[in-house]
Amino acid sequence: MSDSPSLQDSPTPAGSVRSATERTAGLPQLVLLLTASCLSVLGAVLIAPVLPQIAQEFADTAGVDVLVPIVLTAPSLVIGLTAPFAGFIADKIDRKRVLLIAMVVYAVVGTAPLYLGSLQSIIISRVLLGVCEAAIMTCCTTLIGDYWSGPRRSKYLGLQTLVASISATVFLALGGALGAAGWRAPFWLYVVPLLLVIPMARLIWQPTRHRAGEALHRHLEPVPWRQLLAPCLVTLFGGIVFYALLVELSFVLTGVGVTSTATIGGISAIMSLATAVGAATFARLSRYTPRTLLPIEFGLSALGLVLVFSSTALPVITLGAVFTGFGTGLLLPTLLTWAVNRLRFEQRGRGTGLWTGTLFIGQFLSPILLAAISAGVGGLQPALGVLGVVTAVAALTTLLLVRRNNERLDVTRD
């Protein structure tokens, strides 16, 4: 079989046929969808380095200490709340149309802080940015599921996590560099989607699926909510674990006496690399079932968190970050593939939106829960230790409760 991306990786389901004129997806479509998938990362991390400057700029605003962090976190919460609705619209109307509109609006509201004069108006623009990110993430992931099937779909969903992990490191560096020119400067990067809109309009298409002898469905096929319950519940907790050390590692390092920003950045980059390696490994392991992979992934993450808790020595903390990064990098595509592989074309947008929403709610809850645990156990490192123990319990729970008869992750139904 040729290694070029193709829609023909596995047989189509019985009773369905593809249009004779339907196009075949290839590298251009993959590059566009993976690049657009990074926009939610851009929204999440780009302005983190300039938050102190924003706080200083709006120091006279009432509640500035609460409002400035919301500028960073608002998009994640909004994605969590609106992604299922974005999936509904994508299924009901048209994936491509929703994606292109969201890309244009993303650029408009993303760059709005360049000229907005109040903290409240900036937060409103960030809320609207989150709505756009929800639509973009849901449509891109859904289209990857539409265009490819079988092992190749698993490979590209893992690649989506890998690219997002690498882009987070790049965007943090860009945000810091642009921030030297003022706190508004990083917001110029939100024009990037406009560079993708024209290629997307030409190269991305709305797939169509026909049942033999029938017209296209006008009514939405019901989503198997019970089937999605287990993947989404595990994803909610997985999102908390995934973002815990990603957000808190720099605070841990500062707490053990590290003052060099280069050292903090270097260890954070090592963890990001481990996450990328974990995501890249998924393609080789997708022949296994969730019941096999989830205990390993949660187990590695738990080991890393406990190591970070157990020592103030940098080599031990770094090793813990590597274990957790690798485990969560492998975890994310496992959870995504587990959720979407069992969905039919007509259900995929809503199912993907629900999964995306639960992941980002987990991301939003992660620092809040760790702050609450920290207050109860006397510090951030002990809180990470508690999360490590809970994650170890999750590893055992998935081994015992996830169904034995789950399909391999490289087997698709549509």
Model regions and ranges:
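Helix-loop-helix hairpin linking two adjacent transmembrane segments in secondary transporters
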Residues: 150-151, 159-205
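Conserved MFS/SLC helix-loop-helix module at the cytosolic interface between two early adjacent transmembrane helices
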Residues: 80-118
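A late C-terminal transmembrane helix in Major Facilitator Superfamily
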Residues: 342-378
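Helix-to-loop junctions at the C-terminal end of transmembrane segments
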Residues: 82-94, 277-290
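Paired small-residue
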Residues: 109, 120-128, 315-323
